[in-house]
Amino acid sequence: HAALGRRPQFAEFVPDMRRLSGFLSPAEEEAQRAAFVADFMQRAEFQGIYGSLLTPNQAANFIAKLEEKAGVTLPATTTTLPGQPPQYGRAELIQKMSSGEFTAAQTLRAFIEQKVVFDAFFFRAFVAMQYFGYLLRDPEDAGYNDWVDVLTNGRGSIPPGDFRHLIFGFVWSVEYRQRFGP
């Protein structure tokens, strides 16, 4: 939840994920994503943060608040690489919303799909997914932060970005193995 400045909770993640998965054509998947973003923007928490910033004349403030909550700064310019969603510089994204070319929902989605946002949240999201997938619960802060630190910085003989140790830790945890019996 880069836009909310916090980690998603298991109880909200599961129904959200159900909405975005399944046997969908590319067109259906795109429609589901657009509908999800529009619905997400109606949530009370989102409205409480951004409700007054969703009009074209508030585009710069909307982007600034998104950057603040996500803890990132969009680059001045950027290049879209093959396989990436379109990448926009900060001023270009503001211009697209302020001119009406992008709605607030399209601007939010474009922001979330920027490489700088992806890079800032990838390890955190990966760790949260291990808790959600293996342990079926929210992470406790200490364990979550420790795993994010290991992925980000490495530890001992574990190099940064080595997912094998993280996955091994979850698969061999007592909590996970007890899900399947004594």
Could you say what each language-model-derived stretch is?
Residues 1-182:
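Composition-driven recognition of low-complexity segments enriched
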